[in-house]
């Protein structure tokens, strides 16, 4: 299977551009530069493939990760790995809170275990800016979540269902306000359909959804939720 992008991008994308434009090919290049061992070590540090720790009887458990041929490449853009929405949200929170991974809880004012520093504070600051541009810039994939007064940042994901490549899982993880995040919101739509009657206000233009991707459904839903809770 050939790895490709949905649309053609410039060949000289920076790391920031790769994230903003959601380039699969760019992600593969970055992963190869990082190297498989470094990638493995970082994934282990994030705990996204471990059993979730939370005060619930029943929790989703990620599928075992087997490092076979091309696994590094497919993991780099999210197709070669499974995790739970809870763990993904926790990881994104760590990415923007100064780099500290805090285990989630459903208990208010629970005594928090010692958090683990998984990225530097400087890297976290840069990621906040990039995630904001995913929503606010012309090249970004999540402009439908750009709601006045909320300063939303985030990252889109359009993936194949595990074991069924015909079905899609479209996700959007948002953080807001992006300059000093207080909230993280995860929206996941399994095998969504395009609403042919829905007219979007897309960057000042009225249009229908041209693609069945997270930028046109999960992002739209997240924007509506953020407006409601705001």
Language-model regions, residue ranges each:
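Beta-lactam-recognizing serine transpeptidase/beta-lactamase-like catalytic domain environment
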Residues: 1-200, 214, 218
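Short, gly/Ser/Thr-rich active-site loops of penicillin-recognizing serine hydrolases
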Residues: 112-115, 205-230
């Amino acid at each position: 299977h050939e790895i490709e992008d949905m649309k053609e991008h410039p060949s000289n994308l920076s790391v920031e551009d790769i994230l903003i434009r959601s380039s699969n090919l760019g992600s593969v290049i970055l992963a190869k530069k990082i190297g498989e061992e470094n990638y493995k070590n970082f994934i282990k540090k994030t705990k996204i493939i471990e059993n979730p720790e939370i005060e619930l009887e029943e929790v989703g458990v990620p599928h075992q990760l087997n490092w076979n041929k091309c696994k590094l490449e497919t993991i780099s853009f999210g197709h070669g790995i499974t995790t739970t929405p809870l763990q993904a949200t926790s990881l994104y929170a760590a990415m923007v809170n100064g780099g500290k991974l805090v285990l989630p809880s459903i208990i208010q004012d629970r005594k928090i275990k010692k958090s683990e520093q998984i990225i530097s504070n400087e890297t976290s600051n840069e990621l906040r800016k990039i995630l904001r541009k995913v929503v606010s810039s012309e090249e970004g994939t999540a402009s439908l979540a750009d709601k006045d007064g909320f300063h939303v940042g985030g990252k889109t994901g359009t993936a194949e269902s595990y074991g069924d490549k015909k079905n899609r899982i479209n996700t959007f993880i948002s953080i807001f306000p992006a300059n000093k995040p207080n909230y993280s919101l995860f929206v996941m739509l399994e095998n969504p359909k395009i609403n042919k009657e829905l007219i979007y206000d897309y960057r000042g233009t009225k249009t229908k959804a041209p693609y069945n991707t997270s930028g046109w459904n999960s992002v739209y839903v997240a924007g509506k939720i953020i407006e409601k809770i705001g």
